[in-house]
Amino acid sequence: IILEESLGATFVESLGGTPVTPEIEKLKKQGWWFEQLYATGTRSVRGIEAVVTGFPPTPAQSTVKLSLAQRNFSTLAAILGQQGYESEFIYGGESHFDNMRSFFLANGFNRVTDENDYVSPVFRGSWGVSDEDLFNKTHERLVEKQKTGKPSFTLVFTSSNHAPFEFPDGRISLYEQPKNTDNNAVKYTDYALGKFVEKAKTSDYWKNTVFVVVADHDIRVRGDSLVPIERFHIPGLILGADIKPRVIKTVASQLDLPP
C-alpha cells in the first residue's frame, strides 16, 4: 500500500482538480480506478487508522495514539501475519511521529524503516528524505523480499507533499512560482510514484505483487461550517500484473480497503 500524503482529488484533474498528477492519470488506465473514494478525516493519522485497521474515526485522538490500542489491535499486518506474511512500514521521515512506530511494531508489523536507514539520500528536507529516496528504498526492499520467497506486506508513506513542500530541483517542470507550493510538491510526488512503478514493472516482484495507491486525506479543512464533502474526495488505484483496467463508480471510503 502506497499512502500518499495530502494527495486528494484537489490535485487530480480527472476528479475535478488541478492538473498536477499526470502519472496518476496514466496509471489509472492500467488498473482499478476508484472515482468516488473518500477519506475518513483530514489528518495523516486518520488515514493511517482507516487504511491499516479499517477502524472508524474516534473522537479527539486516533486509535494510533490511544493507549488501549498499543497492542493486540487488529491491523492488516496482524491479519496477514496469521497467514505467514512479514510486514514492514517504510517512511522517509521520523517514524516516531504520531506514534506510528510504536503502534505498528506492537500490532503486527515486523519492521519499520525510517529516515535513519537511508545512506546518502538524494535529498533531505524538513520532513526527511525525498519521495524518490523513499521509493528507491521500497524497490530495494521488495527485491530483497522477492528473493526470500516468503509473502510480505509493505506500507509505504510519502512525505514530500507536506509543508514546507521541499523537494529536489530539476525533476519536474514547475506548475507555478515560487517552487515550494503544494501544487509543485504534488507534481514531484506524482513524478516519483511514476518512476517507481516504471522500475517495478521491470522487476521480478511485479508479477506477484498487488499495489494499492491511496491518499491519506485531501488538503486541510478548517472552520465551523457544513462539512465540505468534496474536500474528503481522494484518488484510489489498484495496480498489478494481472489486474485488468476497471473504473469503479461505487461510493467507498478508506475503511473499505482492509477486511
Identify the meaning behind each predicted range.
Residues 1-259:
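Solvent-exposed soluble domains appended to multi-pass membrane proteins
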